[in-house]
Curated annotation (Swiss-Prot):
Gene3D superfamilies named in the record: 1.10.3730.20
Signal peptide: none
GO cellular component, one term: plasma membrane
Any single biological process term in GO: glycine betaine transport
Gene of this entry: mdtI
Localization terms from the record: Cell inner membrane
GO MF: amino-acid betaine transmembrane transporter activity; antiporter activity; choline transmembrane transporter activity; spermidine transmembrane transporter activity
A Pfam family annotated for this UniProt entry: Multi_Drug_Res
Major localization class: membrane
Subunit organization: Forms a complex with MdtJ.
Protein task: Catalyzes the excretion of spermidine.
Lineage, highest ranks first: Bacteria, Pseudomonadati, Pseudomonadota, Gammaproteobacteria, Enterobacterales
UniProt name for this protein: Spermidine export protein MdtI
Length: 109
């Protein structure tokens, strides 16, 4: 793997933001009944994978994918809480803690 460069971290951050945007648009699409939000969600997913493909040029795939997925899930949970009033139950919180612990373990290995 190439030496770490901040540009790859920036690509990863962009991929995470685009994943969150895609998930929010998907919720707004109401099961694709509101087609414009469905199409925007698909475009954001494509853009997220494109950004992720640039990130893995300088970050190990396993690390980049774990961070992308983990931060994407955690931030999507926050967006669901802020925008839609969605709450996690106790099992959901335990799952989130395990997810974050897993991300840390992958990064440390």
């Amino acid at each position: 793997m190439a030496q770490f460069e901040w540009v790859h971290a920036a690509w990863l951050a962009l991929a995470i933001v685009l994943e969150i945007v895609a998930n929010v648009f998907l919720k707004f699409s109401d099961g694709f009944r509101r087609k414009i939000f469905g199409l925007l969600s698909q475009a954001a997913v494509l853009a997220a994978f494109s950004a992720l493909s640039q990130a893995v040029k300088g970050i190990d795939l396993s690390v980049a994918y774990a961070l992308w997925g983990g931060f994407g899930i955690a931030a999507t949970l926050a967006a669901g809480w802020i925008l839609f009033g969605q709450r996690l139950n106790r099992k959901g919180w335990i799952g989130l803690v395990l997810l974050l612990a897993g991300m840390i373990m992958v990064k440390l290995t």
